[in-house]
Amino acid sequence: MRDVTVTGLDKAFGAHPVLAGLDLEVPAGSLTAILGPSGSGKTTLLRLLAGFERADAGTIGIGGVVVDGPGVHLPPERRRIGYVPQEGGLFPHLTVAGNVGFGLPVRWPGARRPGARQRRAGQVEALLETVGLAGFGRRYPHQLSGGQQQRVALARALAIEPAVVLLDEPFASLDAHLRASVRADVQEIFRRAGTTAVLVTHDQDEALSVADRVAALRDGGIAQCAPPEDLYSRPADPGLASFIGDANLVDGVVSGSTVKTLFGCLPLDPAATIPGSAGQVTVLIRPEQIDIVPNENGLTAQVTSFRYYGHDAVLYVQPEDEAGGAGSQPVVVRVAGGTHRAAGPHLPAGTTVTLLARGPVFAWPAD
C-alpha cells in the first residue's frame, strides 16, 4: 500500500487549460474519490496518475518515488498501477480466469518454473474469491451481469499487486438497482485488501457513500479534500455547498455561538470561522435539517412542488413574510417517506406548512 502525492500539477491541451496548480494527498490504504462535473478534468487527472499523459508542470509521487516531474516520466507499466476503465475493458474472447490472469505472466517472476500454471490458476481463483466470483473462472464476459463484469475488471487490476488502483467512473454504466450494491462490494474489497485507490466520479452520492476522502475538483484545482461528512456538512464555500448536494443558503447574523435566520436563532457549528464571532453571514441549512411540524411555532410556508421517492420526499416551499405574503427565497425540505403525512395525506402546491430548522448550522462570512 502506497500513498500518492500530487504537487502543483498543470495540464493543458493546446490553448485549453484543464488542470492548474493542482495539489492532492491520497493517504496509503485509503479510497479517495475525485468529484467534479463533466469536463472538470477528472479523467485527465486519472490519466496523469496512470502515466497515460505527461504533466506540463508539477510532480506526481507514488510511495515517495517521483513518477512524473521535471525530467522524469515513468511509463505506466513501471508505476504498478491497476486501472479499471468505465466499461470494464474485459477481453470478450477470454474467459473470466483469462481476463483476471492476463497480467500475471509478465508480473510474476516464477511464471516459467515447473508448476507455475497451477500456482497461477490458484492465484486467479483466490482473486475471484476476493471479489465474490468464486467458481466463475470458465465463464465469458457476455455471460456476466454488468456488476459481475466490473468485479472481474477489479480482480484483474488487483492481480498485479498494484501500489494504487485507479477507477474511472466504474459504476456509471450500471443499472440504478445494481449501482448501490456494487459500490458496497467494491468498498469492502478495498477495505479487506488495504489497497490505495483513487476513484473519479461526477455523482455526489457515489463519492460520499464509497470514499474515505472526497476531493472536489473545481477550476482546475482541488477546492476541498476532506472526509465525506466534513465535505457535506462543512464545505469550504457556498458554491461548493450547492455542488455537493441540495443546499438552503440563507442570510444570517451571528452573535456568539448562535446565528439568527428566517428560522429563528440556531446554534452555530463550532467549526465555522467567523471573524470577531459576529456579523453578517451566509448560513447553510441542508434540507434534512428542516422538519414539518404540526401546530407549533415555526416558519410558515406554502408548498410549491412536492416529489415523493418512497424512502423520502422532497418539498419545495416558499416562506411567507410577517404579513402573510411571499417572503424570502424558496426553501428545499427533505423528510423521511411518510412523515410528510403529519401535514395531511397529500401536499399539493398551495398547501400551508410550518417548518422548524435544527442546528448546528455551518456559515461563512457574507461577501
Positions of PLM-derived features:
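Non-catalytic connector elements of ABC transporters
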Residues: 258-367
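Helix-to-loop junction immediately C-terminal to a conserved catalytic motif
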Residues: 50
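ABC ATPase nucleotide-binding domains
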Residues: 80-82, 86, 90-239
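Conserved coupling/switch loops of ABC nucleotide-binding domains, chiefly the family-specific signature
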Residues: 56-59, 219
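Conserved ABC transporter NBD signature motif
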Residues: 58-69
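The feature captures the beta-strand-to-loop junction immediately N-terminal to the Walker
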Residues: 35-37
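Conserved structural motif at the start of ABC-family nucleotide-binding domains
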Residues: 4, 19-21
